[in-house]
Amino acid sequence: MVKKGLRLLETKAFSFSEVMMKAAVLEKPGKLAIRELPDPSCPTGGVVVKILRSHVCSTDLHMWEKGHPALRYPRILGHEFAGVVAEVSNEEKRLKVGDRVQVYPGIGCGSCEYCRRGSENLCPSMRILGFSLDGGFAQYLALPKSGVENGCLNIIPSSLSLSEAAMAEPLACCLNGLEKVKLKKDETVVILGGGPIGCLFAMVAKHQGSGKVILVEKDSVRISQARLGLEVDLLDANNVDVVEAVMELTGGLGANVVVTCFREAALEYSLLELAAPGGRVLMFSGISADKGVVPTDLNAVHYRELALIGAYGCTAVQCQRALGLMAEGLEVNWLISKRVTLHDLEESFSNLASKNVMKICVEP
């Protein structure tokens, strides 16, 4: 359960200067407003980050379209972002003004069992920028002392652009997922969904030595976009029986790893039938609450020794690893379809909903 976060303009948490910043504020589902808000002052022990690049995630789209029972309004969305340190508290000695930083959006308690073992994404008291706290669709963000102490700011390698650095969070989520399934060299991976996350999963799987990556997608635009940046087997789910096609590509064995990368994947595809004996099915995407319960053939799990594994979010350390991967040459720029300002953000949500684009980069 997410701890209740700071309300927008909640002066109990921060004091504000008179200078104004722009922010895209979700006032209720379907209503996004560009507001001028006071620039945040630096919290004791914390920092102020000038946000220079943010990416739009499908989770942001879902919040805009349908909201969330735990989301309090008004709220500044955005959890994939990077910028520069604009102000540092006198108590903070590790960071300095001008440092380029990628922001890990989760602030754990730092003391629970999960935080102590490096799984802060599972912290029961986790506060999330762009959900329980205001996020990255603004010109500035004040990060409290707890965020700084828990490693939310990662220094960006000099070889990376800010747009690339802002991609670290979704890339880290893919690293987390493949760590959970313990992907081995030469294994076959089937990825259901050819959007940005599916493409990132494909790139990481190839980088980690997967022998064959099979990407399954229905949308013709996304299939064309994926072809531009990936060297994988692409299946158009409109034109083939996906299970038969996967079996043909794997010599009748199926995939060692199956990954769900969109909300309806478990409803549209026979996940267990795609997996080889001893295979792992990674539930990376959740299922929309209004879709009900998905039936599972537990006998297939038992007799074929299948493993159903969940993965949620990522950790700050995984964001560091993602930055390192990109610095080593993992190319993600091709995923950016469009660059916009905050004023264009609502239109960008509509573009993302129509699947006409991959990643949209916001330059506040």
Stretches found by the model and what they are:
Residues F14-M21, Y269-E273, P277, T315-P364:
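C-terminal hydrophobic helical "lid"/dimerization subdomain
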Residues K4-L8, K12-A13:
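N-terminal amphipathic/hydrophobic targeting modules at extreme N-termini
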Residues R100, T188, G279-R280, A307:
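Short glycine-centered segments of the SAM/dcSAM-binding site in methyltransferase folds
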Residues S158-N239:
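Mid-domain Rossmann-like dinucleotide-binding core that forms the NAD(H)/NADP(H) cofactor-binding site
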Residues K218-D219, I287, C314:
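Residues in the short beta-alpha loop(s) of Rossmann-like NAD(P)-binding domains
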Residues V181-K182, S224, G229-E305:
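Glycine-rich cofactor phosphate-binding loops and adjacent beta1-alpha1 units
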Residues C109-L192:
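NAD(P)H dinucleotide-binding glycine-rich loop of Rossmann-like/cofactor-binding domains
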Residues P38-S54, G67-R116, P157-S159:
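Glycine-rich beta-strand-centered segment in the early N-terminal region that forms part
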